[in-house]
Amino acid sequence: MLPFLRDPAACLVPVILTALLLLAIGYLLGSTPSGYLAGRWLKGIDLRDCGSGSTGATNVLRNVGKGPALVVFLIDVGKGALAVLLAKTFGLSDWLQVLAGLAALAGHIWPVWLGWKGGKAVATGFGMFLGLAWPVGLACFGLFMAVISIFRIVSLSSVVAAIGLPLLMVVSGGSSAYVVVSLVASLMVLWRHRSNIERLIAGTEPKIGQKA
């Protein structure tokens, strides 16, 4: 670990440059269009024009298949985790770690390569919190799986996990930076699921195995 990265007052310029570099890397990692590529390469389709219009793993599952959806899910998880772990490797503060993670989320939701239309940040957010505070990340995943096993609705599971995230972070004693970013990430996921929430309220949201 580089000592000056823990003491910005000692040498501010390297800290700023390192932070900006990691933010750029985080965004580029997040914007890697794994779901879009799976649709193009395997089915010759543009996921933005299919189903929910998302490039995430759920839309891949519905329109491409289970195997590709699993691969896309793992890649998307890795994008969020890697962005945070790079910041940790360079010894950056909690606040800069969470900014790197948020950059990955932003890249996933608004990828420059796809006209700013990407996924819904669930898998990438999961990876981000595995990197920041893995017990909280695993707890959210457990909550997600519990809801999906009962109701078989991915969006409902995502919404419940997003709501539970900041609560779990507070209970776990996470730092102020981690608590704040858990709330921000939760709001980002909920905002991306606003159409799903409308369908959930109307009772028209499809279950696993049904077309959107």
UniProtKB/Swiss-Prot annotation:
One annotated Gene Ontology cellular component of this protein: plasma membrane
Record flagged with keyword Transmembrane helix: yes
Enzyme Commission number(s) of this protein: 2.3.1.275
Protein family: Belongs to the PlsY family.
Record field: catalytic activity: an acyl phosphate + sn-glycerol 3-phosphate = a 1-acyl-sn-glycero-3-phosphate + phosphate
Major localization class: membrane
Taxonomic source organism: Parasynechococcus marenigrum (strain WH8102)
Name by which UniProt lists this protein: Glycerol-3-phosphate acyltransferase
